């Protein structure tokens, strides 16, 4: 029984948007010797997808019917689960009736080996992201030559450039747009109430990414926006050498 959402998405080759920034569906999966089951909100499944899954030997069930399904199964069944990802309620329900064996899920190692289609998709996603970032760098330099901008304005503009690609789906996480001292804060998050103005001097960090139909990107860049102090130059160089 699988409950880790990215593993299920990979195993059945399905994508959804149930969780912000992540192309996964809230679901469970059970794989038997000769067939498989997917527990998911059925209104998300089109007739075409349902037919394709059926052809692949995958039976669909309502997400909330997992326990009902398990209650109807032969008590002689044995279920294998990864307790690093299986939640407490599911594990307890299984253990009341069945033999449960704790294993490490085989999927992470399997999906770590990329096929040609996946590799080509990654490269294409990176090229698409490079186009958006090039536009962003040009825009940032020109805007700052006219007036300061806020950290959120910069983040929103980067998303707009990415979304110009027809195969852009969403950002892959909330953009970290951090100017000056804010860039030193781990996972800094600008808000309308608390953010800094960006000026044509000092250092600006942007940590962002996108979900494209072909793959996912995640980049971090630290940009000099004007003349730097000797300390800024030294810090930047030491960080670069340490990578």
Enumerate the language-model features and the residues they cover.
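Active-site neighborhoods and metal-handling regions in enzymes and metal-associated proteins
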Residues: 1-243
